[in-house]
Amino acid sequence: MSGEEDLIDYSDDELNNETTAPASNGKKGDAAAAAQNVDKKGSYVGIHSTGFRDFLLKPELLRAIADCGFEHPSEVQQTCIPQAMLGGDIICQAKSGLGKTAVFVLTTLQQVEPVAGECSVLVMCHTRELAFQIRNEYNRFSKYMPDIKTGVFYGGTPIQKDAEVLKNKETHPHIIVGTPGRLNALVRDKHLRLGNVRMFVLDECDKMLDQIDMRRDVQEIFRATPQQKQVMMFSATLADEIKPICRKFMQNPTEHYVDEDTKLTLHGLQQYYIPLEEREKNRKLNELLDELQFNQVIIFVKSTIRATELDKLLRECNFPSIAVHSGVSQEERIRRYKEFKEFNKRICVATDVFGRGIDIERINLAINYDLPADADSYLHRVGRAGRFGTKGLAISFVNSDQDKEVLQQIEKRFEVALPEFPKEGIDASTYMAA
């Protein structure tokens, strides 16, 4: 068995250096027109149990949905769930916060037939935090399905513990969620056997398939699964260059582009920029945190060092801050993530490792202390605020010629004009829910 040092880890630098081409104009799925008044409630896009009876879901799933207080299916759920239930391969692009995770979680739970010691559903994503979150969604929706076991495997934890879980038929998960590096190591060392996988899911697929190392891991894992299986891929952004790569994993997939490219911005999210010098950032950030009303705020920076230093500075100024980045141990990252999600901290300083797919419903303010390198990264970052169609506020610091170019890319890509943040501030009612 190879040691921990053989595992590929994906650092913030690798994520930051990646460039993503603009996604093409999407086409609406045939069923998209059926979406009516989407009611966002609780910690997920609402879904009504009556609507799911139309999908012929198991009573156990309907009961869990009702317990969560969900009310209406979102457009992506109405579009994709019926197709996914038929067992066909699916590519789905829809903007952040509209319930893509629920599509594959509910679909796979509906179809899974648990056999002791066998994995029949494999879900991969690009960060440990997202894997942890997806596993929790499985636990939430399978609460009345006691025979279903779900496990999560990612780097930064002892691989021997994973091997012990997989060796025992009593603890071996039927549904496995994980990151490509750790899963590939488990397959390579013959701890994880995938000969019975029936459903293969990639969440934020473009992030994994656009990076050579991560794509290689995904391909190795894919080869270890049966040829006949259902493959589903999801993302908020999907560049033209990535779509042919996605299709290589599939057989005649149906493709669902729930929102057109220019509509990928988030409804209810107020977006502004502030021009300033690098040396002025800390003072301006302090002013904003003092003056703005918010439930929770996420502040994005470009490196782990800057995250650590800014978090330290904020705490010295008596702001309840926490930092999440790849520079801390995995156990500590998960602990901090849970602390922030459970509202024990109101301010989180993060790198792009926290910029995709993380659902924390109380975040209603996102600040780009450092502007990202491209429009796609901007969308994923500001999408942390205003999730589930709620109100939110995003403010970006712009201090270099490169920042100005990125700002122009964002405005051109999404056909919006980002105004300068007013010196007199803004009315809190425009971004705070009543």
Curated annotation (Swiss-Prot):
It holds the Pfam family DEAD. PROSITE patterns: HELICASE_ATP_BIND_1, HELICASE_CTER, Q_MOTIF. A motif (DEAD box) lies at residues 203-206. ATP binds at residues 94-101. GO terms for biological process: mRNA processing; mRNA transport; RNA splicing. One of its GO terms (molecular function) is RNA helicase activity. Disulfide bonds: none annotated. A motif (Q motif) lies at residues 50-78. It catalyses: ATP + H2O = ADP + phosphate + H(+). Its EC number is 3.6.4.13. Belongs to the DEAD box helicase family. DECD subfamily. This is ATP-dependent RNA helicase SUB2. Residues 1-32 are annotated as: Disordered. Residues 1-16 have a biased composition (Acidic residues). Transmembrane segments: none annotated. ATP-binding RNA helicase involved in transcription elongation and required for the export of mRNA out of the nucleus. SUB2 also plays a role in pre-mRNA splicing and spliceosome assembly. May be involved in rDNA and telomeric silencing, and maintenance of genome integrity. InterPro entries: DEAD/DEAH_box_helicase_dom, Helicase_ATP-bd, Helicase_C-like, P-loop_NTPase, RNA_helicase_DEAD_Q_motif. SMART domains: DEXDc (SM00487), HELICc (SM00490). It is found in: Nucleus. Residues 268-429 form the Helicase C-terminal domain. SUPFAM superfamilies: P-loop containing nucleoside triphosphate hydrolases (SSF52540). The Q motif is unique to and characteristic of the DEAD box family of RNA helicases and controls ATP binding and hydrolysis. Keywords: ATP-binding, Helicase, Hydrolase, mRNA processing, mRNA splicing, mRNA transport, Nucleotide-binding, Nucleus, RNA-binding, Spliceosome, Transport. It comes from Chaetomium globosum (strain ATCC 6205 / CBS 148.51 / DSM 1962 / NBRC 6347 / NRRL 1970) (Soil fungus). It is an enzyme of class 3 (hydrolase). GO terms for cellular component: spliceosomal complex. It comes from the Eukaryota.
